[in-house]
Amino acid sequence: MSDADVSKQIQQMVRFIRQEAEEKANEISVSAEEEFNIEKLQLVEAEKKKIRQEYEKKEKQVEIRKKIEYSMQLNASRIKVLQAQDDVVNAMKESASKDFLNVSHDHHVYKRLLKDLIVQSLVRLKEPGVLLRCRKEDLHLVESVLDSAKEEYASKVNVHPPEIIVDDVHLPPGPSHHHGFFHHHAEAHGPFCSGGVVIASRDGKIVFENTLDARLDVAFNKKLPEIRKWLFGQVAA
């Protein structure tokens, strides 16, 4: 084989190797591009999924905040309604408390009422001796009905008339324009007393508060569900 033939054969082999190498390189390039595209697609999809999840999370948070805000507004509205209802009820109680002033100012009516309150208190305690406390301005009226009250009690329960000692310490005076009507629990018997009596056993272990204010509290609290139903069409919880 001549040198020319050898050279020609070598060139053919080189071209073949080069062509094969280029084909392999193209295959690798195509394969790499496909893998890159797949990875890129996966990354894009993963990022899309992440964005969707973030959006859904934020959307849920917004919904939760809306529900919380709505609940807070609803509760605030309910509190305002309840406060307005309480204001109406308290105004009724204040009006009733003011009416007691007229009762204590009518000495003839109030004198009879004081006697009834004393008898009722004696029946409740059923003690042979008691201590009575009243307002200073009621002292003369109380003293004027003590004997008849003791006799009426003794006749009712068939016992001897009890010994009643009028306490030197008096209940607070009647309310004036300087006092509110609903702060009467701030002191022992309140800063004011609309009238009535407080009777205790001699040892002080049994105390029956039979003041007009205490009677109003008992009656009002007892009737409060009916009052609320009448005013607002519902029974208080």
From Swiss-Prot:
It comes from Gossypium hirsutum (Upland cotton). GO terms for molecular function: proton-transporting ATPase activity, rotational mechanism. The lineage of its organism: Eukaryota, Viridiplantae, Streptophyta, Embryophyta, Tracheophyta. One of its GO terms (cellular component) is proton-transporting two-sector ATPase complex, catalytic domain. Keywords: Hydrogen ion transport, Ion transport, Transport. It comes from the Eukaryota. Belongs to the V-ATPase E subunit family. This is V-type proton ATPase subunit E. Subunit of the peripheral V1 complex of vacuolar ATPase essential for assembly or catalytic function. V-ATPase is responsible for acidifying a variety of intracellular compartments in eukaryotic cells. HAMAP family: ATP_synth_E_arch. V-ATPase is a heteromultimeric enzyme composed of a peripheral catalytic V1 complex (components A to H) attached to an integral membrane V0 proton pore complex (components: a, c, c', c'' and d).
